[in-house]
Each structure stands twice: as C-alpha cells, then as structure tokens.
From Swiss-Prot:
Residues 3-146 form the Clp R domain. This is Chaperone protein ClpB. The Clp repeat (R) domain probably functions as a substrate-discriminating domain, recruiting aggregated proteins to the ClpB hexamer and/or stabilizing bound proteins. The NBD2 domain is responsible for oligomerization, whereas the NBD1 domain stabilizes the hexamer probably in an ATP-dependent manner. The movement of the coiled-coil domain is essential for ClpB ability to rescue proteins from an aggregated state, probably by pulling apart large aggregated proteins, which are bound between the coiled-coils motifs of adjacent ClpB subunits in the functional hexamer. It is found in: Cytoplasm. Homohexamer. The oligomerization is ATP-dependent. ATP 2 binds at residues 605-612. The gene is clpB. Signal peptide: none annotated. One of its GO terms (molecular function) is ATP binding. Residues 6-71 are annotated as: Repeat 1. SMART domains: AAA, ClpB_D2-small. Residues 341-545 are annotated as: Linker.
Length: 854
C-alpha cells in the first residue's frame, strides 16, 4: 500500500506512531501506537468523533497505555521499526472501506472504523466502551457530510466552524457575556434585516466605544432567552476569528481554503447559523496576493444569495475607507447606524453592569460613582465615546480600590519601615559600652516595644477589615453564580430548580451579605472598599491632568471670589479682571452659549501693563497650573503660507502627519487658556481660521478631525493704539474711542464682532508699581528660601526700586530690570563669596546712592 494514499493528517499520525514505538523500545509499529497517536493529535478529528459517540476518553487512554505496556520490548534498539502485520492488515481494511465509499485517499476515521473489529485486541478494547460500530458509522457519515475524500488535506478543513469561530450563543448560555442594557431599537433593526429573504446582512456602524459588539452580544442573549421572532429561534450566533483564520496559513491558497471550508460548513447548516464579523473592514484585502481573491470577494456570492446570514461591525471611518470603495460588497450589507448613548442612557447601562464589576473587583460601587463616571467622562474626556469611557472609569477606579485592599496600607508600611530603622540603630549601639549609649539603647528598646505593639494592633485591624471585604466579595460571587443557574433552569423549563434558587438560595445569600454589610457599617480605619465619586474624579484627573479639586470643589464660592484671586497676581486693571471674571461665571452658570468658547477677549494696551500676566493668572485660577496656558506667538505667522502650521499641512505636503500647532495643543489639553500673543502681527488669513473658533467653538484640522474649543478661554493680545493710550492718559472715554478706531482700521468687522469683549488696559500708575514690586520681591524671596536665606528690604530701598523702575511708557518691565540690577546681581556676588551662609537673614537698606546688604 502506497503511503501517498493516506491523508496528510493520517501520515502525520503514522509518523507520531513510529516515534511512540521507538520511545517504548517496541520492535514494530502496532495498531495501538497508531490509535494513541490519532487520539493525541492536535486539531485531529478522531478525539471529537469519539467524544461525540460517547467514549470515555480518559478510560480509553488508560486502556491504550496498558496495551502499550503489554507489548514486548527489545534489549538493544537500533531505532529502525517497521509496520507490524496487524497494522498492515488494519490499513488494508481501511483501504477497502475507502474504495467502497469512492475515496481517493484513506482518512483517519476509516482507520478507526476498521479498528472496531471484534477479533482484534484493539477492537475488543474499543467495543468494551459500550459503543456499537453502527453508532460510530453514523457519526462518521455525519462528519463526512456525504462527500468523498478527494483531497489529502480534507481533514484539516473539517470542523472549520469549531476551529475558526467562537460560539457567542454558547457564551451567553454560560453567562460569560455582560448584560446589554437599552439599545432595543438597534437590536430590533438588526433582527429586522436578518429576517429579510436576500441581502439579510446588517452592518453596525458607529464610532469606537459606542457598543457595536455589545449589540451583537445582546442579540445572542435574546436568542438564548427565546426573545426573538420564530425565524431566529434556536439559531447559533458565531463570531468569526480572523486571527485563527490567518495564523499559520504559510502557503498561497491556504487562507482561501480555510475560509472556503468555513463557508461550506455554513452552507451545510442551512441558515441555522448567523456569522458575526467584528472589524468587517479586515475582510477587504485579507489574503490578497497577486492574482488571488481576497476574503471580501469570496463572501460576495453567499451574501447576495442570502445563504450566509452575516452581521458586520465597523467604524464610520473604516467603512468609508474600505467597504464603500467596493460598491458590490457595500450593496450586500444593510447599514445600521449606532449613535453614542446620552448621559442618562449611559447611567442606565452602568447600573446594569455594576454587579459584574463589583463581583470581579470585590468592592462596592456607589450610585454617586456611576453618575460621576457618566457626567465627568462626558465633560472632560472629549476624544472618546460613551459608554466605553464611562465603563473604563468605573473599572479603573474599582481596580485601584482593589489594589489598595490587596497591598499593605500606607500607615502599616510606614510603621514597618520605622521599626526596621530603629532595629538597625539598636544593633549599631550594642557595640558601644559607655553610659550615654546604654541610656540611648534603653530608650530605643522602649520605642521599639511601643511601635511593635502599635503595629500589631493595626495589623489585626487590617486583617479583620480585609477578611470582611473578601467575605462580602465571595458572597456576591455566589449570588451571581446562583442567578446564572436560575437562568439556565428557566431555559430548560426546570421549574423546581428555578423556584429553589429564586426563593431559597438567593434570599439566603442576600441575608448573609446584609449581615456582613451591617457588621462592616462602621467606617473602616485602613481599607476603603467603596468606589465613590471622589475615586472616579481621581481617575479622570490622572487621565486628563485636570486637578480633582476643580471637579468636586464647590465652584460657586471660588467663582464669586474670582476677582480677588486674580488681583493677587495682576495689580490694577480692574476693568479687564471684571470682564474676564464675568465671562467665566457666565460659562460656569450655564448661561453662555454652549457652542462657543468659555470666553474670547482682545486685550489692548501698552507693553508691560499685565496683559500676558492676566492670562497666566487665569490659567492658574481655572486649572491650578500655568501649564494649562497654550501660548502662541502670532509674530511667527506673518507669511500667508504659515497659516497651515496652525491646523496642519494639507495632504501631500511635508509635515502632514505632524498635525497642527494649535489643533494638536488643544486636542491634548482641551481645558486650557489659549493666548494668541501680538495678534496684530499675524497674516490677515489667520483671522479666517479664528472666525470658526470664536463662532462655533470648533476647528477642523488637516486630517479632518474636529477639535473642540468649547472648554477653552481664547485671549488675544495686541499693542494697537498704545500710542493713543499714552497721549490721552486720564481720559478713559477718549482713550477707548481712539483705540477702537485703530482696531477697526486693522481688523475686519466680522472678526471684531465675534469677540466677547475688547478690553483696554490702562498705563500703570506709580502706586500700582509698588504692588508689583511686592509680587516680584515675593518671587525672589521664594527662590532664596530654597537656599535657606531670607530677605528684608527697608522702605527706603523699596522706594528707590520704585523710583528707578517706574516708566509709564514701558510699564512694569523696567521694575524687573531694576530688581535684577540693584538686588539680584549684588546678592549673587555676596552669596558666591560666602558672606551669607544657609540660615542667614539678609536685610537691604540704602546708603548714599547704593543699596547695601547686611
């Protein structure tokens, strides 16, 4: 008999049988070697076949091992083994069966059938399992599906659905899928399309994270619960595993062969299976080689005829990029658009998922946390979609609490480290022998005993709190399990089990949980086991960099005292501070237009009067850090072509991938103060871009992504009209009119019209310079404090600085230079000369025409 008459799987099994015989020092390959190899073969069809007809695999394996041990062994094996007569007879019998069935190749299942012979030891072992030959013949007939074996690789394409798909209905039955809350319209629309006669293939299209896969999971759960029309009852929903389909397809045509096997098996199911392809766009071009068909083209005929019930899921961008280009594939699918759920719907979804996350993490999630997750994620995480981002917040906050429970509390850790430190000190002191050391040692011993007692008490509290938390988590797990068992009993119609679980098991467990919770009602000293809105805010803060206090602090009081807060840094300029404060309050109170930036201002005035400083103060007030200030120097955008730098270079130009200077900054920090410095120096075309930002609070970059400016404060500064401000000092009305004339002459009306407020800054008066001097000196004192030095200035020294540093034309900047020249420069020399050691107090006073330090 020729070896090439065997299928590739049987050839591999024969090779494994040879290795088995050599390993056991047997003189020849026996039928028992071959059956053992077939039973252990990866991806073989024999083991599933035996399990299907009722064989006990463990008992069979044990019987085969006994047979192997009973075979004779040779003393000095050469490693050269041949087929035994029994195995040759078995293969000839299989050959005869293959000829009867019209097969060109001998397959593994025919060898198994031939082995079921009462006259052989192997046959007796197989028949001893209580399975008849007739039952095995029927199972083999089902496996072959009435087809002849005309291809050596035919066994690899069998059970293609088991190999290359995941049964979602089975997972739903086992309770492994999360509950799907809401989404009734989308599920109903999907069912409606699936019920069509032809082109019954819905494709779910939506942004990433809106719940497309969840809709299919919801459909699987409805099929299991029988909550679908008769046409879909008892159907299986299988998810195609593209990774398994492509993995290991080394040769050309192997991928197509696998996909064809899947499609053939689906065809045999006669519409009893719905195929779900997640990331549908991956089918277009998958397996594509020169002259070969891709997966999308192989699916087309089955999709058009209605033979294949298929549900796809993909994002809007990928649908446009891959599927819309292939019009023939697109027309075979029916679009079902999946929108982002509202905040209220997200809260309902989170409430439905809450139990699953509580059981997984072993913590309790409050309703406040759920509401905070929906609201904060919607407000602060703008580049992702609900409900995904809200679920992620809950998950991460719960994970954080769980991590705290599992690791040693901070207080215990601190005591532990202190104890180790004291014990090291004790060992060092034991080597000394004088009186002072003995006293110190006795004191140390006292401290160690006291700390050890404190540590033991805390450890006991920690362990009892931990046990309480874990006990509660275990009971919750049992309740979840009982609910799944009740669902399974309901589907089977086992009313007795269902009643027992519903009215006995679950109430008992809930009572136990209540007792544990009642016992743990007192506030835990060391462990937090609840996820509250504070934990959610902490996670949002980690993601976005927006301080937690800003989300939860009573903003009302903070906003009412906004002017005082800003005046700590900005001296004078009451009109500007009030204008900015009012705009922020309008926005926070919800009275401002929600589709525009929180505020947009044009700051006008001479140099050095606090225009940029007010922006920095505003960024620090709103977001707790000056880092939230996005500063763009508009003098860099003087040429027409430089406009593209703000939103990114157009496609085809160098730098397209990098994105825009302004748009990328706001995408990364959507909550910020945007400062466009020296705006009058920019090219007029820049203002065309700004119109969209000021009117709609949005800007589209060169990649087509919309950047949200609604949470920003846009401030533009300009020196226009500063000469008129100096000339008309003291006359506010005339000043403003002159400046507005200059502004109207330079900017277009549609640009000025979109700005919330044009603020004119006044030149600084002498008394205001004194306040600024205090702020500047305060910063210097802070720097000196880092070197453990303090600085005190006499009134005369301060007056001298103000006199030297006051210049109405240049504002406060000359004061900074005066402090550098008269204070910082001489101080630096004295410190480097070693005159002032750390801890020294430095006083500055005027002697003659100089400021001296002592």
């Amino acid at each position: 008999m020729r070896i090439d008459r065997l299928t590739s799987k049987l050839q591999l099994a024969l090779s494994d049988a040879q290795s088995l015989a050599v390993g056991h020092d047997h003189p020849a390959i026996e039928p028992v070697h071959l059956l053992s190899a077939l039973l252990e073969q990866q991806g073989g069809s024999i083991k599933p076949l035996l399990m299907q007809v009722g064989f006990d695999i463990a008992a069979l394996r044990s019987g085969l091992n006994k047979e192997l041990d009973a075979l004779p062994k040779i003393q000095s094996p050469t490693g050269d083994v041949n087929l035994s007569q029994d195995l040759a007879r078995l293969l000839n019998q299989a050959d005869r069966l293959a000829q009867q069935k019209g097969d060109q190749f001998i397959s593994s299942e025919l060898v198994l059938l031939a082995a079921m012979d009462e006259n052989t030891r192997l046959g007796k072992l197989l028949l001893g399992q209580g399975v008849s030959r007739k039952a095995l013949e029927n199972a083999v007939a089902n496996l072959r599906g009435g087809e002849a074996v005309n291809d050596p690789n035919v066994e690899e394409s069998r059970q293609a659905l088991d190999k290359y798909t995941v049964d979602m209905t089975k997972r739903a039955e086992e309770g492994k899928l999360d509950p799907v809350i809401g989404r009734d319209d989308e599920i109903r629309r999907t069912i409606q399309v699936l019920q069509r006669r032809t082109k019954n293939n819905p494709v779910l299209i939506g942004e990433p994270g809106v719940g497309k896969t969840a809709i299919v999971e919801g459909l699987a759960q409805r099929i299991i619960n029988g909550e679908v029309p008769d046409g879909l009852k008892d159907k299986r929903l299988l998810a195609l595993d593209m990774g398994a389909l492509i993995a290991g397809a080394k040769f050309r045509g192997e991928f197509e062969e696998r996909l064809k096997a899947v499609l053939n098996e689906l065809g045999k199911q006669e519409g009893r299976v719905i195929l779900f392809i997640d990331e549908l766009h991956t089918m277009v071009g998958a397996g594509k080689a020169e002259g070969a068909m891709d997966a999308g083209n192989m699916l087309k005929p089955a999709l058009a005829r209605g033979e294949l019930h298929c549900v796809g899921a993909t994002t809007l961008d990928e649908y446009r990029q891959y599927i819309e280009k292939d019009a023939a594939l697109e027309r075979r699918f029916q679009k079902v658009l999946v929108d982002e759920p509202s905040e209220e719907d997200t809260i309902a979804i989170l409430r439905g998922l809450k139990e699953r996350y509580e059981v997984h993490h072993g913590v309790s999630i409050t309703d406040g946390a759920i509401i905070a997750a929906a609201k904060l994620s919607h407000r602060y995480i703008t580049d992702r979609q609900l409900p995904d981002k809200a679920i992620d917040l809950i998950d991460e906050a719960a994970s954080r609490i769980r991590m705290e429970i599992d690791s040693k509390p901070e207080e215990l850790d601190r005591l532990d480290r202190r104890l180790i430190q004291l014990k090291i000190e004790r060992e060092a002191l034991k080597k000394e022998d004088d009186e002072a050391t003995r006293k110190r040692l006795a004191k140390l011993e006292e401290d160690i005993v006291k700390l050890e007692r404190e540590y033991a008490d805390l450890e006991e509290i920690w362990k009892s709190e931990k046990a309480e938390v874990q006990g509660s988590a275990q009971i919750q797990q049992k309740i979840e399990q009982a609910k799944q068992e009740m669902e399974a009993a309901r589907r089977k119609g086992d009313l007795e089990s269902m009643a027992r679980i519903q009215y006995q098991t679950i109430p008992d467990l809930e009572r136990s949980l209540q007792m544990v919770d009642q016992h743990g009602k007192t506030e835990n000293q060391l462990l937090r086991n609840k996820v509250t809105d504070e934990e959610i805010a902490e996670v949002v803060s980690k993601w976005t960099g927006i301080p937690v206090s800003k989300m939860l602090e009573g903003e009302r009081e903070k906003l009412l005292r906004m002017e005082q807060e800003l005046h700590r840094r900005v001296i004078g300029q009451d009109e500007a501070v009030v204008a900015v404060s009012n705009a922020v309050r309008r926005s926070r109170a919800g009275l401002a237009d929600p589709n525009r930036p929180s505020g947009s201002f044009l700051f006008l005035g001479p140099t050095g009067v606090g225009k940029t400083e007010l922006c920095k103060a505003l960024a620090e007030f709103l977001f707790d850090t000056e880092e939230a200030l996005v500063r763009i120097d508009m003098s860099e955008f003087m040429e027409k072509h430089s406009v593209a730098r703000l939103i990114g270079a157009p496609p085809g130009y160098v730098g397209f991938e990098e994105g825009g200077y302004l748009t990328e900054a706001i995408r990364r920090k959507p909550y910020s103060v945007v400062l466009l410095d020296e705006v009058e120096k920019a090219h007029p075309d820049v203002f065309n871009i700004l119109l969209q930002v000021l009117e709609d609070g949005r800007l589209t970059d060169s990649h087509g992504r919309t950047v949200d400016f609604r949470n920003t404060v846009v401030v533009m500064t300009s020196n226009l009209g500063s000469a008129q401000i100096q000339e008309l000092a003291g006359d506010r009305e005339a000043q403003r009119a002159a400046v507005m004339d200059a502004v109207n002459a330079h900017f277009r009306p549609e640009f000025i019209n979109r700005i919330d407020e044009v603020v004119v800054f006044e030149p600084l008066a002498r008394e205001q310079i004194a306040g600024i001097a205090e702020i500047q000196l305060g910063r210097l004192r802070k720097r000196l404090a880092e070197r453990e030095l303090s600085l005190e200035l006499s009134q005369e020294a301060l007056d001298k600085l103000i006199a030297v540093g006051f210049d109405p034309v240049y504002g406060a900047r000359p004061l900074k230079r005066a402090i550098q020249r008269w204070i910082e420069n001489p101080l630096a020399q004295l410190i480097l000369a070693g005159k002032f050691a750390p801890g020294a107090s430095i006083s500055a006073k005027v002697e003659g025409d100089e400021i001296v330090f002592a």
